[in-house]
Amino acid sequence: MKKEKLRTENISFQYPGAATYALKDVSFSLFEGEWVSVIGQNGSGKSTLAKLLNGLFLPEAGTITVNDTMILSEETVWDVRKQIGMVFQNPDNQFVGTTVQDDVVFGLENIGMPREQMVERLNQALRLVRMEDFLNDEPHSLSGGQKQRVAIAGVLALQPSILILDEATSMLDPQGRREVVETVRQLVNEKGITVLSITHDLEEAAQSDRVIILNKGEILEEGTPEQIFKSSHMLQEIGLDVPFSVKIAELLKRNEILLQNTHLTMESLVNELWRLHSKK
């Protein structure tokens, strides 16, 4: 059984002066080596959730427990932040160093890590995101996807238990998004890192292990991408779309071309269509 890395129990939060709760009675768990995506409309509570998990806000009710022992509070917030690393949406706003290596070691320097250990962490983190060949490059020479991979490396160098991506691909072009998504999948599969992705991108969410739908501050649905994206009508009712491959599969079904599987990527859809064509 996988180890529970984070648990929220009935957490609620209301902004001062707001008539309604931004989050209400939200409960879920994250497990070791799992990638969970949180999706929902603007105003559904996604970004508020990210801020609560990292202690930028504290819940008005309920508890957040990290690594099964540490309950988030004013007294523990700095210890919690050592366990939870965050990457935000704008790659340019996160780059604080003059070169890639300066940026990755910035957090390590702030905690006074010995140089020998710092160099080891730097090289390890850059290898994990496949940016080791860009050690001395300046930020203006990098693409958006490369900058986000450096931002992820900077977080990984601190060795947190959980990585939170708060709309980390929303400002990237398609190639940049692919680079970041491939990096996240590699980190989860090969290193067992736990990832929570707050995202508008349903193609990205389709690549994760589990999807949580937030609607008006509450969890509406939770399940695997296959389970979630089968409910296309429910998603559309709350203003969400479905991956393009799911739309195409539904159109094929209406034309009596029945597929055996739910396809979350165009590649898998094309492969099944090719197999069907080959049987003719």
UniProtKB/Swiss-Prot annotation:
Pfam families membership: ABC_tran
Group of enzyme by EC: translocase
Keywords: ATP-binding, Cell membrane, Membrane, Nucleotide-binding, Translocase, Transport
Domain (ABC transporter) ranges: 6-241
Keyword check for ATP-binding: yes
SUPFAM superfamilies the record matches: P-loop containing nucleoside triphosphate hydrolases
EC number assigned by the record: 7.-.-.-
Annotated membrane topology: Peripheral membrane protein
Any one annotated GO CC term: ATP-binding cassette (ABC) transporter complex
CDD domains: ABC_cobalt_CbiO_domain1
Chief place of localization: membrane
Positions contributing to ATP binding: 40-47
Annotated InterPro entries: AAA+_ATPase (IPR003593), ABC_transporter-like_ATP-bd (IPR003439), ABC_transporter-like_CS (IPR017871), ABC_transpr_CbiO/EcfA_su (IPR015856), ECF_ABC_transporter_ATP-bd (IPR050095), EcfA_1 (IPR030947), P-loop_NTPase (IPR027417)
Location(s), subcellular: Cell membrane
MF terms (GO), sorted A to Z: ATP binding; ATP hydrolysis activity; ATPase-coupled transmembrane transporter activity
Subunit structure of this chain's protein: Forms a stable energy-coupling factor (ECF) transporter complex composed of 2 membrane-embedded substrate-binding proteins (S component), 2 ATP-binding proteins (A component) and 2 transmembrane proteins (T component).
Listed PANTHER family: ENERGY-COUPLING FACTOR TRANSPORTER ATP-BINDING PROTEIN ECFA1, HEAVY METAL TRANSPORTER
Stored NCBIfam families: ECF_ATPase_1, PRK13635.1, PRK13648.1
Protein family according to the UniProt entry: Belongs to the ABC transporter superfamily. Energy-coupling factor EcfA family.
Role according to the record: ATP-binding (A) component of a common energy-coupling factor (ECF) ABC-transporter complex. Unlike classic ABC transporters this ECF transporter provides the energy necessary to transport a number of different substrates.
Protein name: Energy-coupling factor transporter ATP-binding protein EcfA1
